[in-house]
Amino acid sequence: MAESPAFLSAQDVGSFAYLTIKDRTPQILTKVIDTLHRHKSEFFEKHGEEGVEAEKKAISLLSKLRNELQTDKPIIPLVDKCVDTDIWNQYLEYQRSLLNEGDGEPRWFFSPWLFVECYMYRRIHEAIMQSPPIHDFDVFKESKDENFFESQDSINALCTHLLQLKPITDLGEKQIQDEFFKLLQISLWGNKCDLSLSGGESSSQKADIINSLKDLKPFILVNETESLWALLSKLKKTAEPPAVRVDIVLDNSGFELVTDLVFADFLLSSELATEIHFHGKIIPWFVSDVTVRDFEWIVEHMKGSHLESMSACGAAWEAYVGMKKWVYHDHAFWTLPHPFCAMPQVAPDLYAELQKAGVVLFKGDLNYRKLMGDRKWKFTVPFHQALSGFHPAPLCSIRTLKCELQVGLQPGQAEHLTASDPHWLTTGKYGIFQFDGPL
């Protein structure tokens, strides 16, 4: 097999990876420090002087981290005692082993971008963990919750649309298929709401996304949703016993999570699936990623909404969780720096879990980077090849483009895009559905 290309890294001055490490990550760290400052009185109320001291300690550790990053210091081992600490430090050793003699140590602007960016979020977690009694404070909670509240109109419109379709089994197959594609596209464009891309600034969904779908269609660069529909339709007819499990590896909380839950509800209600398994992060991650607290918080706030459609959806979703038709999982692997092709070795239990699915949907850009190994693949390399052997089950990536990595395009397609829109890879304006079917 041909050798895999080099990793994306901030060594390439002017690249998106370089600008992320140079500008966006320090901006995110500054915002985290500011968040801690603003909660000082809350920490004092809850924990007295000890809470204030903890806040000072966390800020001091985060300021040190920001300085290390901005001055391109060597990457240092983690010192906390978490379930993943040893795996992280082994991975740092592995990165060190890849360097040539004159390269020195792994560094922020030199080592693979995926590694150093994940490492930064893991160090944020370490700083909080080392500062009891505020060690369970989610520094990103505020911005995630804000995104949900600012997107109320869009969420309500989406829930109203879903409820108007019910009972979905009464619809004809063609209408179910049309709605399947529509709700998939809504889940795709929900992925635009990414707080790590906006440096933690507001990125809520205020427009009515349902009525925008027609205008957004030309921005889907690869659309393999027909293959996904064909697979689910076939599974529905042939599954023995009649059980179809769909797994969704989540990305952002807030509006995007609601679009994923609406799609999951549709899959159950249309009997295209009998159970949905969601996969989230065990720690706050990449500003807006879903943790179990976010998942439960969204369902609870939907149910408690004064808006009827939202409240009805929230109640239905709570019931799905209660009946185990919706199951939430988290696993330390999702917040490691490893590409997904390493999952069978690093997290065989998680790989075995995904193998139980009829299909696995991977939401968002970070999951795409990990699926592709965050390498400088040519634009025309087939999606299956770039997965480097990762195939626990048929899978589909649903992602808006937010980094300089894209495979599976037609010859000339990337060049045409570059000519018309030089930043097409990084703005979240374009999207893809890429499918890797049954082997």
UniProtKB/Swiss-Prot annotation:
Modified residues (Phosphoserine): S4
Reaction equation(s) it catalyzes: beta-D-fructose 1-phosphate + H2O = D-fructose + phosphate; beta-D-fructose 6-phosphate = dihydroxyacetone + D-glyceraldehyde 3-phosphate; L-glutamyl-[protein] + S-adenosyl-L-methionine = [protein]-L-glutamate 5-O-methyl ester + S-adenosyl-L-homocysteine
Modification note: Automethylated.
N-acetylalanine: modified positions: A2
Residues annotated for S-adenosyl-L-methionine binding in this entry: E256, D289
Example of a GO biological process term: DNA damage response
GO MF: enzyme binding; fructose 6-phosphate aldolase activity; fructose-1-phosphatase activity; metal ion binding; phosphatase activity; protein carboxyl O-methyltransferase activity; protein-glutamate O-methyltransferase activity; S-adenosylmethionine-dependent methyltransferase activity
Annotated positions binding Mn(2+): D251, N252, D289
Cofactor annotation: Mn(2+); Ni(2+)
Domain of life: Eukaryota
Protein's UniProt keywords contain S-adenosyl-L-methionine: yes
The UniProt record lists the keyword Transport: no
Residue positions where N6-acetyllysine is found in the record: K40
Enzyme Commission number: 3.1.3.-, 2.1.1.-
Keywords for this protein: Acetylation, DNA damage, Hydrolase, Manganese, Metal-binding, Methyltransferase, Nickel, Phosphoprotein, S-adenosyl-L-methionine, Transferase
Motif (Subfamily III RTxK motif): 399-402
Annotated positions binding substrate: D251, N252, D365, L366, N367, Y368, R369, K402
Domain note: Subfamily III proteins have a conserved RTxK motif about 40-50 residues from the C-terminus; the threonine may be replaced by serine or cysteine.
The family this protein is said to belong to: Belongs to the damage-control phosphatase family. Sugar phosphate phosphatase III subfamily.
Function: Metal-dependent phosphatase that shows phosphatase activity against several substrates, including fructose-1-phosphate and fructose-6-phosphate. Its preference for fructose-1-phosphate, a strong glycating agent that causes DNA damage rather than a canonical yeast metabolite, suggests a damage-control function in hexose phosphate metabolism. Has also been shown to have O-methyltransferase activity that methylates glutamate residues of target proteins to form gamma-glutamyl methyl ester residues. Possibly methylates PCNA, suggesting it is involved in the DNA damage response.
UniProt protein name: Damage-control phosphatase ARMT1
Gene symbol of the encoding locus: Armt1
